[in-house]
Regions:
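Post-cleavage N-terminal segment of exported redox proteins
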Residues: 1-25, 77, 106-113
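A broad, structure-centric signal for solvent-exposed, well-ordered loop/edge residues
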Residues: 8, 61, 66, 92-95, ...
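The canonical Cys-X-X-Cys-His
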Residues: 29, 33-43, 85, 100
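Gly/Gly-Pro-rich "capping" loops immediately C-terminal to redox-active cysteine motifs
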Residues: 26, 30, 42-75
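Short, flexible active-site loop motifs that bind/organize anionic cofactors or intermediates
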Residues: 19, 64, 87-90
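Sequence context surrounding c-type heme c attachment/ligation sites in exported
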Residues: 27-38, 48, 69, 91-94, ...
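Processing junctions and N-termini across compartments
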Residues: 17, 31-34, 79
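Axial heme c-ligation environment in periplasmic c-type cytochrome domains
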Residues: 48-57, 75-107, 112
Length: 113
């Protein structure tokens, strides 16, 4: 009986966790992107370096680690920045950065249409 109660309690605890802890949120990522990233990356472009867009082919060509883990590569770029891109480590939370990465990956895989 004690085991059953413990199992039920554990299940309730897991089910009550916010979905954000379980998966990235592309809708929220889009909102965060529009607030923090779209000034330079509107519609997946890049106003600073036009050849380094957020389109799939450019991410594959220019973003370290993108081919081995799409969102992981995006998370690293957003978190630590590189070249002209600023770091967002002190601006966005880990969950917010993960949401932005999920949004960018989703948009890139659909051609930013």
């Amino acid at each position: 009986m004690r085991f059953l109660l413990s199992a039920v309690f554990a299940l309730l605890l897991v089910l009550s966790m916010p979905m954000r802890a379980m998966a990235s949120d592309t809708v929220r990522g889009g909102q965060i992107f529009n607030t923090n990233c779209a000034a330079c990356h509107a519609a997946g472009g890049n106003i600073v370096k036009s050849e380094r867009t957020l389109r799939q082919a450019d991410l594959e060509a220019f973003l370290p680690n993108y081919l081995t883990g799409h969102e992981t590569g995006i998370v690293a770029q957003v978190t630590y920045g590189r070249n002209a891109m600023p770091a967002f480590l002190d601006v966005l939370s880990e969950n917010e950065i993960a949401d932005v990465a999920a949004y960018v990956e989703d948009q890139a895989s659909h051609g930013w249409s």
